[in-house]
Regions:
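N-terminal signal peptide c-region/cleavage motif recognized by signal peptidases
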Residues: 18-20
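Mid-chain, structured segments of secreted extracytoplasmic proteins
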Residues: 67-113
Length: 138
């Protein structure tokens, strides 16, 4: 596994691959601190929260088909942000995921792993739904 460093930006493609991001962007936006990005998305761009619990807050940018998930104070990987967006790759759909984690290396690794697992479950569920629709059309 690629070693993570404090303040690093990672690109996670699909559900299993991790590599350091080369560009200074996060899902097509200039890379900035999670706090600054949250403020820009919610205050300047007026995007609404879709979900909030004791660990995360999620915001959807429907125009860019991107979901932004921010850790909240008290989360071990705080301050961090994860952005995910679907990408059609031929007949396959995958989730491109980027992570900016400003926590300790071990906590960043846990955060990345948690989102990899979530992405994997989401893709399995999506595949089941697609297979079910194919069966219904036969």
């Amino acid at each position: 596994m690629t070693r993570l460093r404090r303040g690093c930006v990672l690109a996670v493609v699909g559900a299993a691959f991790i590599a350091p991001a080369v560009a200074q962007e996060l899902c097509g936006r200039p890379s900035e601190s999670p706090e600054a990005l949250f403020d820009r998305l919610t205050k300047t761009e007026k995007l609404k929260e879709d979900f909030r619990d004791k660990s995360y807050v999620a915001i959807s940018d429907k125009s860019k088909e991107t979901v932004w998930t921010f850790t909240v104070p008290g989360h071990p990987a705080h301050p961090s942000v994860v952005c995910r967006r679907p990408v059609q790759d031929g007949d396959n759909l995958r989730l491109d995921t980027n992570v900016r984690c400003n926590a300790a290396e071990a906590e960043c690794e846990k955060l990345v792993k948690a989102f990899q697992e979530l992405n994997h479950r989401m893709m399995q569920e999506l595949k089941k739904q697609q297979d079910s629709k194919k069966q219904q059309t036969k």
